[in-house]
């Protein structure tokens, strides 16, 4: 069974030949993996780890393939731009060094309250437009990957990226006290993404399997956005994303870290098909309960702890955890094996990453004792 058929089967709550697998990681982690496995290209790394999903933004979310940028030169987008949407919005990257090496973080905000205190000032900002891109070659870029892997089209956000624009504390305040400003910023980001990805789907929607929406709404112990704000700000916009994806028979993946147990029924109502990730270290997000309560209506990815097991456990610990998670989540389909945080960082030993996917290949075969 090829990867695309494997992924589509599991996302339709069917059992394929084995549990599909996917991963993202920082650039430094990817470099380390390639060196250890003796491969040079991203394609070869996918093959070496038996990964089934190719992300159009690449392993590190900085862009692998994308439409050609033809917008204003003064924005500073290079001619070889390949899908790093953070650059389009004006975020700047900060390099951080610690005991594990170097990593990067997004600088923020772009439209701070001091410079853009009202909607009138916000209207003067040069918001990105889908017309800044030439989508005519996007199909030819995706086709070579779609022959071998399921395709995840990522980069969309209706809440998290607006918090980067404004600063998370400021936008959370404005959700309550300055609703006009919050709505304006959220709609600017949402409208751009729906237009941008709508044009990609128009060109190559039949090649795409997953539309990934990244909108962190959970902290370690609970939601950090109120139910009323979920209803007002996220629900209508996530539904628009789901409607766009489903128009092209694409599954909508909703990424959020943290304890989001209370919001899962809402996500299903919004049209979400996949919750990413299951983060086992947080309360109320144990795989067994989630599978039992929502597994007939929702698929899952993640589940292998990226806070404890992967960075601090032994290879044997990782293998045992992978087997445990597969035994719980794999029956009946609806599960993609992945870390409990989708982007692995430098604190995770290379041997543990390799062990995770080797164990997935070994224990994830159907039919299994757990089915």
Regions found by a protein language model. Give the residues of each.
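Active-site loop segments of alpha/beta catalytic cores
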Residues: 1-36, 102, 108-110, 118-371
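A contiguous, low-structure linker/loop signature
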Residues: 64-126, 148
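Segments that shape or occlude catalytic/ligand-binding pockets
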Residues: 35-71
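Aromatic-residue-lined binding/catalytic grooves and analogous aromatic/hydrophobic interfacial grooves
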Residues: 57, 79, 256
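N-terminal capping/small domains of soluble enzymes
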Residues: 20-21, 33-38, 58, 84-90
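Residue-level detector of functionally special positions within alpha-helical transmembrane segments
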Residues: 2, 46, 50, 78-79, ...
């Amino acid at each position: 069974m090829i990867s695309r058929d494997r992924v589509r089967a599991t996302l339709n709550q069917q059992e394929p030949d084995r549990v599909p697998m996917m991963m993202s990681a920082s650039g430094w982690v990817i470099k380390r993996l390639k060196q250890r496995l003796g491969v040079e290209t991203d394609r070869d790394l996918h093959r070496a780890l038996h990964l089934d999903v190719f992300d159009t933004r690449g392993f590190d979310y900085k862009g692998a393939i994308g439409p050609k940028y033809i917008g204003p030169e003064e924005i500073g987008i290079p001619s070889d731009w390949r899908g790093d949407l953070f650059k389009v919005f004006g975020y700047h990257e900060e390099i951080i060094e610690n005991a594990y090496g170097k990593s990067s973080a997004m600088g923020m905000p772009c439209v701070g309250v001091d410079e853009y205190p009202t909607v009138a000032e916000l209207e003067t900002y040069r918001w990105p437009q889908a017309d800044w891109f030439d989508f005519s070659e996007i199909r030819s870029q995706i086709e070579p990957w779609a022959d071998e892997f399921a395709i995840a089209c990522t980069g969309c956000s209706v809440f998290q990226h607006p918090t980067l624009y404004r600063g998370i504390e400021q936008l959370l305040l404005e959700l309550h006290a300055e609703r006009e400003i919050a709505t304006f910023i959220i709609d600017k980001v949402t409208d751009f993404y729906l237009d941008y990805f709508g044009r990609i789907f128009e060109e190559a929607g039949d090649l795409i399997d997953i539309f990934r929406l990244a909108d962190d709404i959970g902290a370690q112990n609970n939601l950090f956005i109120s139910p009323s704000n979920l209803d007002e700000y996220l629900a209508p916009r996530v539904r628009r994303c789901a409607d766009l994806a489903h128009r092209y028979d694409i599954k909508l993946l909703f990424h959020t870290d943290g304890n989001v147990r209370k919001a899962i029924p809402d996500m299903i109502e919004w049209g979400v098909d996949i919750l990413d990730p299951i983060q086992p270290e947080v309360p109320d997000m144990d795989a067994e309960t989630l599978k039992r309560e929502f597994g007939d209506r929702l698929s899952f990815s993640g589940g292998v702890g990226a806070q404890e097991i992967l960075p601090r456990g032994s290879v044997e610990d990782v293998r045992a955890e992978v087997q445990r998670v597969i035994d719980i989540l794999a029956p009946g389909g609806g599960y993609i094996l992945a870390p409990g945080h989708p982007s692995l960082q430098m604190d995770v030993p290379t041997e543990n990453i390799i062990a995770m996917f080797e164990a997935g290949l070994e224990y994830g075969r159907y039919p299994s004792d757990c089915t």
